[in-house]
Design a protein with these regions (language model features):
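A short coil-to-beta-strand element that immediately follows conserved catalytic motifs
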Residues: 1-7
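Generic short beta-strand segments
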Residues: 7-10, 92-94
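Conserved double-stranded beta-helix
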Residues: 64, 68-88, 92-93, 98-184
Length: 184
């Protein structure tokens, strides 16, 4: 079970410098290396090329015992991919937006992060999306935004699922309860 943690649109224009390497789970206080607490997806809306700032990735960095030191340089690769592609990485993987050395080629992408169902999300989805708008969304989106219980109890409001407060009956069934039902 996971939650939608955050979304970020990234637009890297000509002349922009490389972003500092970072991990998306850098605020997690559990020592590294650690189990995956987050998953990051990076969607390419335009072609990602070495020249226009394709995302830089340090392969295997999710296994390192430290966060990147911004004063140091690290070997990295450019995650080149055509528009319409998606890259999926462990949230502990060091990555950054690359430098755009092109004359007129903008690199546009979307980063969507997911976290463990018991974690606090980066963006507060309860306030980011109005309840009346959430009522119109598919039940799975309501689940991803946190309008459900984690393992049947976490996230309750007076013992009830938060889905009831947006009139979403379908969000009450969690993956945990489905697994438990098939095990019995």
């Amino acid at each position: 079970e996971c939650l939608l943690s955050g979304t970020t649109c990234m637009n890297i224009g000509p002349g922009e410098v490389m972003q500092g390497l970072h991990s998306d789970d850098g605020l997690v206080t559990v020592p590294r290396p650690r189990m995956p607490f987050m998953v990051t997806t990076i969607w390419a809306f335009t072609d990602f090329t070495d020249e226009n700032g394709a995302t830089r990735v340090v392969p295997g960095s999710h296994k390192f015992d430290h966060e990147p030191d911004y004063s140091k340089q690290y070997d990295h690769i450019a995650a080149e991919m055509p528009a319409g592609s998606v890259m999926i990485i462990n949230g502990g993987t060091w990555h950054s937006g690359g430098a755009n050395s092109s004359e007129d080629d903008w690199r546009l992408g979307l980063s969507v992060q997911y976290c463990q169902g018991w974690m606090r999300q980066q963006q507060n989805q309860y306030y980011a999306i109005k309840p009346e708008d959430m009522r119109e969304m598919p039940p799975r989106l309501a689940q991803l935004c946190g309008y459900t219980l984690y393992r049947g109890i976490m996230g309750h409001i007076d013992g009830a699922s938060p889905g009831g407060f947006i009139g979403a009956d379908a969000v009450d069934e969690t993956a945990y309860s489905r697994i438990r039902a098939t095990a019995d």
